[in-house]
Amino acid sequence: KKYPDFTVLSKKLSSLYGADLTSSLSKHGESQVIKISVSGLDDRYSLDDVSIAKELSELLCSVIFEPNVKDGAFIESELEQERRQLLDVIDSEFNEKRIYAMGQLIKHMCKDEVFGIKRYGTAEKIKAATAESLCKAWQNLLKTAKFEILYIGDSPADKAKEVFAKAFANIERNVVTSSTDVVKNVSKEKHITEEMELSQSKLVMGFRT
């Protein structure tokens, strides 16, 4: 809410001596990992004894805990922009047949397992998502997800700790622990063939041990 568009956010980052804000999404086993990080100047180099660590922590908490939400929903125009970008990523993976073949292997081999779900989900799920449903998912994530906070730098982490402690104090947490279901045996082998016009075929094999 404090930084409703990229222009305002860029100005804030520039005011913090060119700080950098990044995010990424990945899968580690059966867990989906969302990483949001901010990096900037060490406190000892700032002017007027301003705590850059505190400012960066407040910025990060603002992004995580106070996104652009209105009437219980994300901003529709921003949602559509992100939806298009995500669908483009999925399309690009289809065009890269090596990545696509590996994805299809995991999809069919782990059909009824959490591990079989792609990190971005499916195009159908992305198209069906609404501003309201995503807002509810974000609220649920804040309550149930496991958070790991890493602070790296020469300056003391005290001020950063205070910022995050204050942010989490307003949330009723009920962390859900994930478990791994290992399926070692299968009753029958699967053979999946997809026919396409390609100059080079892709063969992928999966084994359980």
What label would you give each PLM region?
Residues 1, 146, 173-209:
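His/Glu-based metal-binding/catalytic segments typifying zinc-dependent metallopeptidases
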Residues 1-7:
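Short intrinsically disordered, low-complexity coil segments enriched in acidic
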Residues 3, 120-123, 192:
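A generic, residue-level signal for flexible/boundary positions that often mark functional hotspots
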Residues 8-176:
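Charge-rich, well-structured scaffold segments of protease-associated domains
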